[in-house]
Amino acid sequence: MIMYYLIAIALVIIDQLTKWLVVSRMELGESISVIDNFFYITSHRNTGAAWGILEGQMLLFYIITTIVIIGIIYFLHTHAKGDKLLSVALVVILGGAIGNFIDRIFRQEVVDFANFYIFDYNFPIFNVADSSLTIGVILFLIATILEEKRQKGKSKS
């Protein structure tokens, strides 16, 4: 179980380190081209959730994130034992939730910086924690689908 928590801790450290680099070395709104017309590091802040929804609702985010963190830890210890994919999915979500929670507690906003242009579409700016949440949810869905297939296979036998 400790190994899984180390994954979450590593993600939080990477998330907070990258955000610290952006905050300490860039002006708000400043953008650095990494790959022209595709990937930029852009110093951006967000007081809402994904794509700025529920902007400024910090108390709501504190409550929801606390419940989610407790729920993930509970689920990890009660339902994910023995399921490596589900355990990894949960700790990746946990790392992302904690990463953005730290920002909300100490900055009252989330630091975003990964800015991609896909063709002519400017994808919403995000961070490592956001990526962790997205990847974790995808892994969770895959784990759920695989478990359903296993259960169907058992019931047919």
UniProtKB/Swiss-Prot annotation:
Pathway: Protein modification; lipoprotein biosynthesis (signal peptide cleavage). Signal peptide: none annotated. Keywords: Aspartyl protease, Cell membrane, Hydrolase, Membrane, Protease, Transmembrane, Transmembrane helix. It catalyses: Release of signal peptides from bacterial membrane prolipoproteins. Hydrolyzes -Xaa-Yaa-Zaa-|-(S,diacylglyceryl)Cys-, in which Xaa is hydrophobic (preferably Leu), and Yaa (Ala or Ser) and Zaa (Gly or Ala) have small, neutral side chains. The active site is at D112, D130. Its EC number is 3.4.23.36. The chain crosses the membrane at residues 56-76, 82-102, 125-145. It is found in: Cell membrane. This protein specifically catalyzes the removal of signal peptides from prolipoproteins. This is Lipoprotein signal peptidase. It comes from Oceanobacillus iheyensis (strain DSM 14371 / CIP 107618 / JCM 11309 / KCTC 3954 / HTE831).
